[in-house]
Amino acid sequence: MPKIPTIIVAALSIPENLTSDDLFVHLWHILDGFLQRNLKIASYASDGSNVERKLQRLLENHAIRTRMVSIKHGSGFRDDIKIKIPFFGSQPIATLQDPKHLLKTFRNNLFSGARLLTFPNSVALFSQVHEMSQADDSPIYRRDVEKLDRQDDNAATRLFSGDTLKWLTTHRPQHLGLIVYLFVMGELIDAYESRSLLLLTRVQMVLRAHYFIELWERFLDISKYPAAKHYVSPQCADITRTLIHGFFQVLYIYRDHCSIRQPLFPWLLSTEVVEHVFGMCRQIVKDFTMLDFQFMVPKLFIRMREALFSTHISDGKARASGYNHTYADNRGLDIAALSSYPTDSEIAEASTRAYGEAESLFALLGVSAADIEAESSTLPSVRSWFYETSYEDDPENEDQPEEEQYDFQEVLECLEDSNPSTIMGDKLLRDFRYANIALSVDEQTTMYVLI
């Protein structure tokens, strides 16, 4: 609930090399202790790392039973959306991802030199955002784009804001791919972060993102665009699916499994509070040990209460400021809207509307959903642009270049997301980018030779 101070229940000192199986032992010990004491745990969130996502899957597999909920597909002819809710004892628990981390992941994928986000008649790429940042009336700062802090919450929020969309539609309406990408993904995060939207409106926003992503994946598959180059990273796609399904998991849990009607505050169901606690620890002792942490706990309780009841509002205009904690910001809070749960029929109607919106957005990008959904698509394959040759049969070219390049892109993305701050780290990242450009030029040269 808003204005309820955070309680630090447990802390454990662990090494950095623990696997998801190792962490599951600790997670289950804590969770089982809560359940045995009849404490109602509704959700478990993580920040999107590979280990933590696997840990969530291990937790779901440990459920004693599951409840399957179906949402009618908005197209009217595709399979229903299946939402699986795991139960531990009598308690259902949703698995969520941190929405602010996902917003930064969307931004980092857009800025990545390893991929080009491709839509039917448009693309979304870094240079478009860089051009916008140079304008005198730009809604974003140059520091948001040049030498950016990849963990800067404010920079990501500004990029996906309504002001940015307004500027683009006014000054760069030709950048349709970028406009639609920022709108759809930004609305998905707003479904979690808004303090006033009706729950039914949030349902429609989340489903719109689900259907748009579904159409996007289908388009790339039909057109034979390799997802490794023209779609968001596999990690980003997995986190997005978890966030979408997790929203409905927690919605059904609060609606159907709470003994009394409780308002749903989705922005509180994240890892933000944990990050805030660690940030405060570093303010007290910059490089603290486990012993330091134990002595800090009384101070942390006081500081958490001060932060919660303080009238200070975080500075949304700050640059390169890293994490921006807004979970205690209750401006515009509408508890009535957050307590009004939609019925199954209302969710089905919202699903139809959401599909219609996703369909319209894709038509705006140049291809109708009817063409994408057709059994035998008339969309031309990218491979059809080139003549058939015996190049693939040449034994000198059997060194699985696609797999090697895919691995190379994964390494480049990991380096970019790690935000290297040392001179050696910056040099390594620059060398990888140069190597990526060289590979791309070599590939293009090969294509021209074949033609």
Locate predicted features:
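Non-catalytic regulatory appendages
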Residues: I4-P5, A10-I451
